[in-house]
Regions:
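N-terminal secretory signal peptides that target proteins for export/translocation
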Residues: 1-13
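Hydrophobic small-molecule pocket/channel-lining residues, especially in calycin-type beta-barrels
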Residues: 2-3, 28-192
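Bacterial N-terminal signal peptides
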Residues: 14-28
Length: 192
């Protein structure tokens, strides 16, 4: 059984930009391949604005609200019912994980190299590396930010992150949706 949660987060940079997140909680982990020479590398480098109040949703370009709240399985619903925001690790100065860190009102710097992209979040001074060379994660690559691989396609950076450690507030630290080692986050970064 798998639960699919689709999410969209809007982020403003020098141009209008967006991040699309798709979360797949399943036992299988799909793999991304190394960057193809056929895809042009877009210039996404710079400071991106997280935007206050942005949230992932169950669909594209839809405001956050009860009618489009991410679909949760029975276990996640039970967990959410006992959740209180004061339980969030952020109140103990613990770093936020993706995707929760994406929609906090802080900036993110994106730096591009031929074999990797660095995402540096202003909040908690978190660093995240997106590998573009198709490498596989090892058994020790589990972390709060997970292990990210990506490639460029149609003027966008597509990122897939796996290997998260359990985080009590990993998906959404305001609504009590945890993440786990089975979490898969797919992101799309582009500028209009």
């Amino acid at each position: 059984m798998q639960t699919i949660i689709k999410a969209t987060v809007f982020i403003k940079g020098n141009a209008v930009a967006a991040v699309m997140l798709t979360l797949l909680m399943a036992t299988g982990i799909p793999q991304l391949s190394a960057q193809s020479a056929d895809n042009e590398v877009p210039d996404l480098a710079g400071i991106w604005d997280g935007g206050f109040g942005a949230r992932p949703v169950n669909g594209e370009h839809v405001p956050w609200g009860e009618e489009n709240f991410p679909v949760l399985n029975e276990r996640a619903l039970a967990y959410q019912q006992v959740w209180e925001e004061i339980m969030a690790p952020k109140y103990d100065c613990q770093p936020a994980s993706s995707p929760a860190i994406q929609y906090d009102p802080y900036h993110m710097e994106l730096v591009q190299w031929p074999d990797r992209v660095m995402l540096r979040y202003e909040k908690d001074d978190q660093l995240r590396i997106v590998w573009l060379d198709g490498r596989e994660p090892s058994s020790v690559d589990f972390s709060i930010q997970g292990f990210s691989v990506g490639h460029y396609e149609d003027g966008a950076l597509l990122v897939e992150t796996t290997h998260f450690v359990f985080d009590i507030a990993g998906f959404d630290d305001y609504n009590g949706i945890p993440s786990s080692s089975q979490l898969v986050v797919n992101e799309r970064y582009w500028m209009d």
